[in-house]
Amino acid sequence: TNSKEGEFIAEGGGVR
């Protein structure tokens, strides 16, 4: 799972 800038997604995405 990807994430937008500043957002956090625990599902393999994380902070970008």
Curated annotation (Swiss-Prot):
It comes from the Eukaryota. The modification Phosphoserine is found at S3. This is Fibrinogen alpha chain. A long coiled coil structure formed by 3 polypeptide chains connects the central nodule to the C-terminal domains (distal nodules). The long C-terminal ends of the alpha chains fold back, contributing a fourth strand to the coiled coil structure. It comes from Vulpes vulpes (Red fox). Keywords: Adaptive immunity, Blood coagulation, Coiled coil, Disulfide bond, Hemostasis, Immunity, Innate immunity, Phosphoprotein, Secreted. Cleaved by the protease thrombin to yield monomers which, together with fibrinogen beta (FGB) and fibrinogen gamma (FGG), polymerize to form an insoluble fibrin matrix. Fibrin has a major function in hemostasis as one of the primary components of blood clots. In addition, functions during the early stages of wound repair to stabilize the lesion and guide cell migration during re-epithelialization. Was originally thought to be essential for platelet aggregation, based on in vitro studies using anticoagulated blood. GO terms for cellular component: extracellular region. Heterohexamer; disulfide linked. Contains 2 sets of 3 non-identical chains (alpha, beta and gamma). The 2 heterotrimers are in head to head conformation with the N-termini in a small central domain. Conversion of fibrinogen to fibrin is triggered by thrombin, which cleaves fibrinopeptides A and B from alpha and beta chains, and thus exposes the N-terminal polymerization sites responsible for the formation of the soft clot. The soft clot is converted into the hard clot by factor XIIIA which catalyzes the epsilon-(gamma-glutamyl)lysine cross-linking between gamma chains (stronger) and between alpha chains (weaker) of different monomers. It is found in: Secreted. One of its GO terms (biological process) is innate immune response.
